[in-house]
Amino acid sequence: TPIKSSAASDVYKRQEEGVRFFSRKYPEMKYLAYFQAYTNTYDELDSLTSKYEEALACPGVVGLIVGTRPDCMPDTLLDYFSALSQKKFVMIEYGLESTLDRTLTRINRGHTHAESEEAIRRTAARNIYTGAHLILGLPGESREDILHHADILSALPLTTLKLHQLQLIRGTRMAREQAEHPEQFHLYTADEYIDLVIDFIERLNPSIVVERFVSQSPKELLIAPDWGLKNFEFTAKVNKRISERNARQGRLLNPPSSEPVLPGM
């Protein structure tokens, strides 16, 4: 269940509501508390851990997934997650978005790729499952720039990767930039993006689990691209195209690979 609330009591309530909803249909299911939105490691240590413990106290919850920025992960918190991972499932997901510093500066991320690599390595070194998020199609990035992200990520000790297409959202600075300078943006059609994703994963270390190809924004907020496809429909199209192309993850892997660090191994 994705958790957005900052108050510990609200965390338990949100988690309990989610478990109750799904347990009607799946009574034996276990759950991971997903601290998804915003930066879920930016607070005092005691305040953060109280929220995590509140979520874990909910019956049926067996672990945590915590999304955050690569420049907001202190060693003290990683030590907490390392100890917790000995008894619960723990994954840390970092929003990288790009491996190019010029892009990170342009989109005002406020961190460098070196900081992303450092956070990933510190996390994996503690035997914690480590994931990354990447946006494909950011302005100023060529097709080869995008595919080279796969080369760079393949050398990192990542467990999982979530890919997202660039989406223009109403009221954002990027939407204004695209309206003023459309020539600086390439908004992929669904077919173009499917082939881009497959080219990307053919250069990606096969030990990295790709958890997602696309993301979905509320229709009333989305300007473009509007493909009219749900995530599962898009994934089915990717799988079909993979079969047609006889493609496979890692077929064109370029750099020496680095195996992900997995707990218990």
Task: Give the predicted meaning of each segment.
Residues L56-V61, H148-L163, T235, N239-N246:
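Structural recognition of alpha->loop->beta junctions
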Residues D10, S47, I107-E115, E141-H148, ...:
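Alpha-helix N-cap and loop-to-helix initiation/capping positions
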Residues T39-D43, P70-M73, G137-S142, L168-I169, ...:
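Short, small-residue-enriched loops and turns at beta-alpha junctions
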Residues K13-S23:
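A broadly used, surface-exposed interaction patch
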Residues A114-M174, D191-Q216:
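Conserved C-terminal portion of the radical SAM core fold
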Residues T1-A8, Y12:
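Single conserved hydrophobic/aromatic residue that forms the stacking wall/gate
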Residues T160, L168-M265:
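Auxiliary Fe-S-binding modules of radical SAM enzymes
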